[in-house]
């Protein structure tokens, strides 16, 4: 299958790396030749140094024969334009990264499809949903769904209470166990486990299973005593914070700490009345204690500064908060943040790339089935 990715930024680059392992015909387009040259020599893909909104550039990339065209440039308008051009020049299906939630409303779907934009990806919304999934099951660090939710991949950290510590994997129940351990992260090392490998204290273990057996995995990993989240404190009134408040269950009480008074005023207009908006510096521990940090089960740091978010989560952990979530947009910081035991790390660019990857794999399988 021929796939053209427009934009060699963080989303496009991560997506190209994922898809290059799938042995597809991948073409990455960007105007920045330096970005492309770094990728061209390291991954199984082709690059085209041209603007994705240029008709001549799209022709050079062979868009007429593309099965899938994906616009993931930073600018929403360019992604939409590139997808419209690609469809009219012969691309079978298009996906555009957007920043406007209004475009996702069902009443607009047919309109955009007629224009040539078949699917829309809104990273802030995807990140918000991941955050809510993380705090609803506070003992899980990462959660991904596949095959329409029929299969899940979860990551959780091993503490002293885990029943499966120091047991060779081949002794965990053989073929009858309702899960498969697909990876173990030990420090900065990722292990693809074999039967004689053992799970050690502080490992992050990744399981594939079905939702039916999540309680069983919770039991064997010693997480049954983790408290349910009732109180959530969010540091930073970003767009992701707004979307997060819209997806949290009704039984959760949410507070947003925001330093900018103008943004606080705006937040009062766009979030539900049940959400408390507090004007103050989220780095001020005295303020956080006054606002009930010790009675908070989940602390979510969503400022535009990765370092601030990491440090704030570390501080919240030390104050006894069970679940912390940090937005880390600097990709170079992600592995460091994970090693600091701050809980769940969110990067909206990587989430968007992973979501598009899952869409692409599903579309690839569908196309293969249609051609049989």
Describe the function of each predicted region.
Residues 1-2, 8-22, 182-250, 256-262, ...:
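Hydrophobic, well-ordered beta-alpha structural blocks that scaffold small-molecule cofactor pockets
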Residues 2, 6, 29, 45-48, ...:
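Cytosolic Rossmann-like ligand/nucleotide-binding regulatory domains
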Residues 10-11, 15-136, 245, 251-363:
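Cytosolic ligand/metal-binding cores
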Residues 74-75, 88, 115, 125, ...:
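Short flexible coil/turn linkers enriched for glycine and charged/polar residues
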Residues 100-101, 125, 149-150, 160-162, ...:
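Glycine-rich beta-alpha junction loops
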Residues 130-151, 172-174:
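Rossmann-like NAD(P)H-binding beta-loop-alpha module
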Residues 141-147, 194-198, 367:
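Short, flexible, solvent-exposed loop/turn segments with mixed acidic/basic and small polar residues
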Residues 364-371:
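Conserved small/polar residues in nucleotide/adenosyl-binding loops
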């Amino acid at each position: 299958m021929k796939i053209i990715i427009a934009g060699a930024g963080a989303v496009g680059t991560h997506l190209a790396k994922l898809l290059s392992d799938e042995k597809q015909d991948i073409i990455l387009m960007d105007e920045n030749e330096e970005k492309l040259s770094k990728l061209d020599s390291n991954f199984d893909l082709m690059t085209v140094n041209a603007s994705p909104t240029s008709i001549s550039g799209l022709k050079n990339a062979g868009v007429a024969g593309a099965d899938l065209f994906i616009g993931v440039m930073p600018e929403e308008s360019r992604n939409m334009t590139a997808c419209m051009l690609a469809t009219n020049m012969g691309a079978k299906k298009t996906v555009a990264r957007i920043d406007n939630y209004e475009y996702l409303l069902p009443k607009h779907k047919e309109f955009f499809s007629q224009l040539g934009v078949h699917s829309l990806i809104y990273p802030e919304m995807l990140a918000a949903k991941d955050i809510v999934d993380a705090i609803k099951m506070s003992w899980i660090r990462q959660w991904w769904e596949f095959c329409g939710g029929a299969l899940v991949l979860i990551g959780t950290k091993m503490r002293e209470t885990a029943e499966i510590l120091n047991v060779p994997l081949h002794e965990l129940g053989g073929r009858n166990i309702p899960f498969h351990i697909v990876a173990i992260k030990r420090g900065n090392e990722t292990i693809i486990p074999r039967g004689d490998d053992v799970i050690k204290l502080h490992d992050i273990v990744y399981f594939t299973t079905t939702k039916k057996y999540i309680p069983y995995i919770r039991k064997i990993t010693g997480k049954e005593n983790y408290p349910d989240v009732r109180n959530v404190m969010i540091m930073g009134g970003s767009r992701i914070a707004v979307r997060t408040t819209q997806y949290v269950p009704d039984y959760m009480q949410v507070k947003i700490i925001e330093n900018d008074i103008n943004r606080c005023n705006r937040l009062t207009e766009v979030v539900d009345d049940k959400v408390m908006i507090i004007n103050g510096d989220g780095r001020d521990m005295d303020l956080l204690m006054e606002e009930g940090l010790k009675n908070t089960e989940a602390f979510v740091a969503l400022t535009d500064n990765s370092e601030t978010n990491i440090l704030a989560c570390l501080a919240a952990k030390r104050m006894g908060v069970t679940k912390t979530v940090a937005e880390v947009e600097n990709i170079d910081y992600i592995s460091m943040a994970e090693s600091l035991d701050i809980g769940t790390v969110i990067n909206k660019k990587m989430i968007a790339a992973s979501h598009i990857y899952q869409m692409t794999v599903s579309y690839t399988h569908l196309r293969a089935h249609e051609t049989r």
